[in-house]
Amino acid sequence: VLERGKDVTNRMKDVEHFWESGELNPESNVQFGEGGAGTFSDGKLNTLVKDKFGRNRFVLETFVEHGAPEEILYENKPHIGTDLLRNVVAGIREEIRSLGGDVRFEAKVTDFVIQDGKLTGLIINDKEEIKTETAILAPGHSARDTFKVLSDRDLEMNPKAFAIGLRVEHPREMIDHSQYGKGA
C-alpha cells in the first residue's frame, strides 16, 4: 500500500495544526493520509441496503474485527465515531503488515512506467521506481495531480457515477402553510 499522506497519528497532528494555524500540509491533511477523508468524518457508515453482493457486510465485519462496536452490523444507521474510527484504521494497517503486506506513508505515486503499452513500474516521489505489472489505484476525488498524470500517460480512466444533493431552507411559516393550509 502506497499512501501519499502520513499515518493516522501523524496526520492528526497535521490536521490539528491546520485547524489552529490555517497552515496546510498539501500531502497530509483532511483529504490525504491514512484512512482518507472519512477518517475525519463523524464515523457514520453508509449501509448500502441495495448491496446485492454483500460487500458492505464484509467491510462492517472487518471494522468490528478491528475494534468497531458490534452494533454497526445491525443498526439502521451505523456509526463508529471519529476517535474509534482512527483506531480501526490503524488496526487494519497493522493486520496488513502482520500478513506480510508493506504499507508505506509519504509515498506518492508521481508517475507510471509504461513499456510497450503495459505498466512495468510506479515512480514514487519523483525518484524511486517500484517494478510492478499491476496497480490498484484508490486516489479519492481530490488527487487531481494523479488524474493528470494518468491522462498525460494516456492511461484509460472510467468515471464513477455520482449524485449531488442540495439543501433548501424555507421559513417555518411557509412550510406550515404548505403542509396545513390557511389554518397553520
Task: Please report, for each region that a protein language model flagged, where it lies by residue.
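Residues forming the flavin
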Residues: 1-40, 44, 48-61, 66-184
